[in-house]
Every structure is written in C-alpha cells, then in structure tokens.
Amino acid sequence: VTTPVNTSPADCAWGAFDNVAPWVLDPNNIAWEKRAIELRVSAQREVPVLTTPTRTPPVARLVVVVWVLSKALIPWFVKKKLKRFDSPEESRAYISLRMRKAVERLGSTYIKLGQIISSGEGLFPAELVNEFKLCRDQVPAVPFELVKKTIETELGKPLNEVFSFIDTTALAAASIAQVHLATLISGEEVVVKVQRPTVSKLVRKDLRVMAWLAPHLVGRIKVSALANPPALVELFAETIVEELDFRIEASNMLDVAKMLRELNQDRYIIPRPHPTLATQRVLVMQRVSGFKFDDVVGMKNAGIDTHSVIRTGMIAFMEGAMIYGVFHGDLHGGNLFVMPDGRTALLDFGIVGRLTGARRMAFLRLMLNATTNNVVGQVEALRDLGALPMDTDIHAVIKDLNLGDAAIDPTTLSGEELVKEVQRIVKALMGYGARMPKELMLYVKNMVFLDGAIARLAPE
C-alpha cells in the first residue's frame, strides 16, 4: 500500500510536523482537542483525591503488595542482622536486586515507579538506581483478541471498517500500553497505541494503597530522597495519572509541536496524531522511522552529523523548558528516532513538563543560580516551585543542612556539573522532608540522559 501524502501541508506553519503528511491537522477541527484540555485539568484535580490516605485501603491489593514486598525485605533484614554482608555496598546491592524483582512482580504501577527511581541519579543510592534501570518495561503482549476488542469498543466500529491491515503481533509491549503497525482504510500507514485492559483501574488502586502505606513509612527509610514518602507518592501520581488517557497524550503532541515551531526548531518533528482517532485507550498516529538515538554507527554510516543531532536536541529541550514552558518529559533512546535526513522525531508524549507564569520564572532562577553557586537563590527558587512552604526560613534551612557553596567555577561549568549541583541541593532538601517538584524531576532526568548522549554522539 502506498501512503497518501501531502508534500506542502498547511499544518507545518504552526507545528513541527514532517512536510510529508498522511493527513493535515486543522487546529480548529480536531475532534478530541477541547476535551483533552478538560481531561488534563481533571487529572490534576484527581491527584490529591488518589493520594489522600483513606481509612480503609483496597484490602485485597494491599495484602498482595505487602506480601510481595515482605518476601523481598525479610531475607535482607535477617542477613543484615546476622552480619552476613561484607560491606554496606553489598547490602545495598542485595536489597536493590530483590526490590527490583518485587516491583516487576507487582506489575504496571510499580514498574513505572521503579523507572522514576531509576532516573534519580544523585538522589537515590547508586545501587538502587542502577538496578531499577533494569526494570523491564517490555512485558508480555496482550492477546490480539483483547486488543481488537479494546479498539472496536473505543472507536465504535468493527476493526475492518477502520483498518485495511493491522499487525496482530505487537511492535512493542510496555506496562501501560502496546503498539501495533497498521494501515487505515484510506491507505495511510499508522501506528496504533492500545492501552492494556484494566490498567487504569489497577494504577488507581495501587496509588490508593501507596497513599495509605506512605505515612507509616515516614522516618523508617534511611534514604534522603525517601524521607517524605507521601510527597514521593504525590509526585508519582502527578506523573502517571495523565498517562492513562491517550487524548491527553495526543494534545501533548500538539503542544510540543507548537513549541518547536514557535522556537524555529526545524530539526525536530512530531508525528501527527489522527484528528479523529484518539480516545481514552486508543491513539492512532503517523508512522515514522529512523535510527535509534544510540545507534551512533548507523547514523555515521548514513552520513548523519551526530554533533548536530545532539546540539539541536540540547537547545530544543532547554529553550522549550525555559522560554516556552513546555518540554518532553521522558527522553530516552527509545523515544527518539533520527531520520535519514538528520532530523529527530520525538515519540511517546504521555509525560510532558509544563511550567507557566511564576513557576517558569522560578525554574529559570534555579538554573541561573546553580550556574553562579548561589545556594540561597537556588533554595528560594525551589521554594517557589513548591518544594518548601512559602513561609520557610531559607537561611535557617541552609544552615541546618550545611549547604555551603559548592566549589564550582561558573566560567567552566559543564552540563554534568550543573546537574550535579542541582541534585546536591535537591537531595539535601528531600532529606529535610521537602517534596520534589514534578517538572524539576523530569528536567533533571532529561539532562542526565542528554549528558550521556553527548558522550556517545559527540565525545570530543
């Protein structure tokens, strides 16, 4: 099948889309867009409801969670009491391995939580971070009969009235959804993202269990970043709830596309979501392909300038956050495809960082103060981002935590040093009981990824 194309699409004037278009998006005529904006607000309002401890949690799920975690923790606790570990590092490695296996057994919600912890380099123990990086988001695919049922229920039509072809084998299967290649009746080659059955109910049930358990763990975990478990649960809920409605993801795609066009970042493109085929559990989008972001050899053999790829990536990410207040919240090698012409396609918009008004200015102040060794300015900015109450005595906090200025030369500050300076302050504050602002967590996570990408794509 040859995909119908439009080689001078009007939507490229307002969004960073490919100039070869299977369809053209009219911003005034997108069936799900207005509803998606309402859903985003609704999801944000749901977070405090899900994270406020109830008198009685979902008992059946609580029993399962406690049983699985106990099986992971008790052998470690016994070995530690009997002094069977040769070093603290061996002890941390042992418990980290057991916790990772427990997380994988508990399923989608806990796998996602493990992935957030795995992005917390400099905040969580290195053994825990490294072990949770192995947390498998690749899970067994849902049988196609269930996928077919979900698609037909969501779109309100038999499968063969929407697609002339759909691959019954998933291209990828993750904890929240799986992806299938397909071709629309009208001939366009697409990717179909389908939510796993019951995952939405499971995530919400797990969040209620976490919210009930969290207050009982305060003061019991000797890890600075886990000093305030209820705040960590709230951060996690803010991150995952929006992922459960694909109309929000489709809207995120449009917002990032608008941001990139506004900033004239023409080396990055966003796949077009279909203007009508986006529902809570199904998202149809333009198919794109290219080199994986870490396929340096493949890109160089194709004549792609990898220095340009990473340079434009850093600029687009930092400008998006600091100038426009919108940025992709989950950069990793699987979410970026470098196309044969050197442009990069961004994928998977379930998590997007948003900074508006005073919060964006506070974020900008945080970064600027980090580059100039201004600890007072950093802590004030973090307070304004919501990490601390507004009436906090900043100087008293700095004194209590012994947060002296770091020995960093602002004139030679590298990206890695900037990230470590922010991590230093945030880690100390989290040990003090502060909450990690969602946008900061996403930003630091992306900076760590991009810093590693520089080492691979432009090592010199």
Which residues fall in each region the model found?
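N-terminal accessory/targeting segments that precede structured cores
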Residues: V1-Q178, K201-P229
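Helix-rich C-lobe and terminal helical cap/extension of kinase-like folds
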Residues: W23-D26, Q44-V59, S87-A93, E234, ...
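Conserved phosphate/pyrophosphate-binding and hydrolysis machinery centered on Walker-type P-loop NTPases
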Residues: R55-V59, E89-S96, V103-L106, S118-P125, ...
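ATP-dependent phospho-/nucleotidyl transfer catalytic cores
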Residues: A126, K133-P140, E152, S200-K205, ...
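Glycine-rich ATP phosphate-binding loop
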Residues: L181, E188-R196
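Conserved beta3 strand of the Hanks-type protein kinase catalytic N-lobe
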Residues: A182-T183, L331
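Short acidic/polar mixed-charge low-complexity motifs
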Residues: S186-E188, R343
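Hydrophobic residue at the +6 position relative to the catalytic HRD Asp in the kinase catalytic loop
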Residues: G334-V338
